[in-house]
Amino acid sequence: MPYLYLLLSIVSEVIGSAFLKSSDGFSKLYPTITTIISFLICFYFLSKTMQHLPLNITYASWAGLGLVLTTIVSVLIFKEQINLISIISIILIIFGVVLLNTFGSSH
């Protein structure tokens, strides 16, 4: 169950980040409301995850996978450019998260 909480937290964070960009500095009402609600949901599920998993694994997974998914959203939805160094860096982040979850602190 903690990994489901973590997944829900990550997805909520990515949604919140996408709508944060769409809110245009909190000048648009609906994207602003969606941003706030998404981050509330995100931190609720992140706190539930931390009840079951170590902080280092939880936070590294949340931040790393959130960054990867947010980058994908930025490229696909907002048509932002990504270069080879960014792609290599994202692959290394994924590799690091997998290693940490496989060999990190005991669960």
From Swiss-Prot:
Q: Give me the segments passing through the membrane.
A: 1-21, 26-46, 57-77, 84-104
Q: In terms of one coarse class, where is the protein primarily found? A: membrane
A molecular function GO annotation? choline transmembrane transporter activity
InterPro entries, per database record: Small_drug/metabolite_transptr, Small_multidrug_res
**GO-annotated biological processes:** glycine betaine transport
- Indicate where this protein resides in the cell: Cell membrane
One of its Pfam families is Multi_Drug_Res
| UniProt KW keywords | Cell membrane, Membrane, Plasmid, Transmembrane, Transmembrane helix, Transport
Q: Carries keyword Transport?
A: yes
Would I find Cell membrane among this entry's keywords?
A: yes
Task: Return the GO cellular component terms, semicolon-separated.
Answer: plasma membrane
Write down the membrane topology: Multi-pass membrane protein
Checking NCBIfam families in the record gives: qac_SMR_H, QacCGHJ
> What family classification does the UniProt entry report for this protein?
Belongs to the drug/metabolite transporter (DMT) superfamily. Small multidrug resistance (SMR) (TC 2.A.7.1) family.
Protein task:
Multidrug exporter. Is implicated for the resistance to bacteriocidal quaternary ammonium compounds.
Q: What is this protein called?
A: Quaternary ammonium compound-resistance protein QacH
The organism is Staphylococcus saprophyticus
Task: Provide the taxonomic classification.
Answer: Bacteria, Bacillati, Bacillota, Bacilli, Bacillales
